[in-house]
Amino acid sequence: MITMNAIQWPKKWIPGETDNFVSNEVIVKGLDFNKVVQHLRDASHWEKYYKNSGNVHMFETFGFLVEAQVEEFELKDTILRLAWRGWNEAKGDEYLEIYHAWIVEKLDNDRVRILTQESQSGVPAKALAKSVPNAMLNGHQAWLDGLVAYSR
């Protein structure tokens, strides 16, 4: 039996306790772990493979302008843990706050696992949670697919 790593959630962001949560994951054979890590950790690459991103310290995502701050960065030989908190400057019903976490993990048999999960709070998060098709779920899958293709 094999156990894979999991996101380490701060208490405020525990999935199911916020207004919106999505999880996307791929496991790909023959992908270079170091390329994936480089293309994810360096935000200047993002627009080359993910159309729903822009700017570095502040970015627009799903129609919201969000400031961002890295909350976790840990790179070891076989795993990258990366997470950031984002928020907008709006008040009341327009306020949105997010915690977006990633794991890139080198697995046996020449496989790489990429896991991304996002937990959100605020009225906009509630609306995103109800969207059909789910814009955040599909957007993050496009991010994963783009990251994989760009890293090949």
Predicted regions and their residues:
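A conserved amphipathic terminal alpha-helix motif
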Residues: 113-115, 119-152
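Hydrophobic ligand-binding cavity/cleft-lining segments
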Residues: 1-56
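Residue-level detector of alpha-helix boundaries and kinks
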Residues: 21, 30-31, 89, 128-132
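Hydrophobic-ligand binding "helix-grip"
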Residues: 2, 47-48, 52, 60-113, ...
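Acidic, low-complexity intrinsically disordered regions
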Residues: 5, 9, 42, 80-83, ...
